[in-house]
């Protein structure tokens, strides 16, 4: 059945879904292609709007994760370069969200190389400073390892213990890392889907960061969030797509 009711299609002059799919791929005229495109775009925007309404309502659940008045001065002083104006602004906005009684759901969008991981490290340090753990999940082991290396560079000078959990670790290495995470010894962990497996438990997860650069699964992001008590969520993306925008 067509996901858009006939009454709505009639009101907005939209063609049916099957017809739109057929004509967007095999249009007999430019007008036919534009009509099909309008129909599919309408549905995409409708789905996005409904998802936003649902998530805004769900977001009223309160969180116990309150990151209030963190001191980032030591972190900023440890950096070999000054933060840009945009980085300062974004960090301030994220920290304001994390101080709220409601769980944050925020998209951090920026081109590759724009410093998104530095921003993630800064807000992770704020959460860790208040006794929480932070986790960054990436869709590939290579990307997870890159993030772990960058996070280690920024956070280890601050005394933060950073770990990596991926599927390629030996069973013994995985067990040791998971035990350290559960005990709270690892304060910041980067990893892949191994982070959401049932065997992985956190001591006090307060911030979930995911890298959507390669369209990481929304379901897996939600599974990681369920490892904590309504933790704050930050999604990093170079090119936001409708799914990542619907936070």
Give, region by region, the residue ranges found by the protein language model.
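Short hydrophobic/aromatic beta-strand immediately N-terminal to the Walker A/P-loop
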Residues: 105-111, 135, 234
